[in-house]
Each structure stands twice: as structure tokens, then as C-alpha cells.
UniProtKB/Swiss-Prot annotation:
Residues 5-214 form the Glutamine amidotransferase type-1 domain. Its main location: cytoplasm. One of its GO terms (cellular component) is cytoplasm. The gene is hisH. It catalyses: 5-[(5-phospho-1-deoxy-D-ribulos-1-ylimino)methylamino]-1-(5-phospho-beta-D-ribosyl)imidazole-4-carboxamide + L-glutamine = D-erythro-1-(imidazol-4-yl)glycerol 3-phosphate + 5-amino-1-(5-phospho-beta-D-ribosyl)imidazole-4-carboxamide + L-glutamate + H(+); L-glutamine + H2O = L-glutamate + NH4(+). This is Imidazole glycerol phosphate synthase subunit HisH. HAMAP family: HisH. PROSITE patterns: GATASE_TYPE_1 (PS51273).
Amino acid sequence: MSNPDTIIIDTGCANLSSVRYAFERIGADVEVSDDIDKIKAATRVVLPGVGTARAAMKALKDKKLIDTICSLTQPVLGVCLGMQMLTKASQERGGLSYGNSSKDCQCLGLIDTNIEQLDAKGLPLPHMGWNQISPSEHPLFAGVAEGSYVYFVHSYRAPLGDFTIAKCEYGEGFSAAIAKDNFMGVQFHPEKSAAVGATILRNFMKMNAGSFAGNHKSTQESAQ
């Protein structure tokens, strides 16, 4: 029996089933697994996550998945906390101990930015509910209109930068999605974002390792 095209990494987080169902609703062949060989063989990989960065990184370390994820050349999509784990470090220090709990949590280091607390300018935290995004021309957002609504639940964010492929505003501007080469992440929950979320997942399902061959430019450079 052949492996599914898409592996959702079993990080032990609470939203695994909802992410899997979202892919199944669009007809994708997916499996939730922490098997290293299956992850390496997949056409594309999804890294979901809810909770704290420190607890999530400890889970990846305990499953011996960190080196595997960092070595992947196929499309990888981080969702919510999964997006944050693609960065260098996070200020979100709570949860289980992973390294020195008095310091920022070291993440996967695949996208050159850090996660900091969202400056909501007095608005309630977490930022929870529907909000509009401003997407770039990155293929993950093909067919997604300016001002489309997606569903967020978060208190930490990636700042705006060269890696930003979609923007949002909640007290301050922040990255609703980031990317570098084959690694992409969305701060919002596409599995809870109705038709817009389904479009984004379909776009991801069109990608393969060849989509990124020879592409080492920043997202903004590629869009110009």
C-alpha cells in the first residue's frame, strides 16, 4: 500500500483531527503520522500546532523529528503554532521545559524571524475570531482576494518583513503568513476559515518539491 501524498505531523496537539478533516473535505489523501520514513517520503508535509512554543518544541524533540523537518525539501505548511515553530525563536516561554525556561524558546530556525507578543494596543488578547488579510502573489494565496476573512486564535506574532506573504492588522500590523523556499506558515487556521481556508489548502495541494527547485530568493524578491 502506497503512502498518502500528504503527511500531517503528529505533534500531539489538539487540532490534528480538524486539520485532517479540512484536507479530506477537499479530497486530499492525508495521514497523521510521526513516522520519520513516511514524513520523508511524503509529497508534502503539514506541521500543525496549538498551545505553547516550548511544549511543542519539546514534543518534536522527544519524537526525534527536529532534524527530519529541517531537512525536508518538499512543501511544508505550518499552521498557527506550527508557523511560529518555523522561525528562529519565540518569546512564548510557557509550557513544559525545553532548554532554559528563562530564555526565549529556540524554534526550528527555518525562517529568519522571531515570534513576539502581539501589541494589540488595548484590544483583547488572544486575537480570536475573523479578521481580514492582505495576501501577496505567493502561490499559496492564488485566488484569495484582498480583504478576505480568515479565523485567528493567537497572542504572539511574527513581525512584517521580507518573509511576509500575507498581512493582517490587530492593534499593529503583523504577518498572517510567512514563507522561505519550500517552508510556508499561516498564523490563522485554514481549517476554520470556510471557503477561503479551503482555497489555501487546495493551493498547497498543488505544490510539490519541483515548485521550489532553484528558488532561493526572498518572498518579496520573487514577487517583484
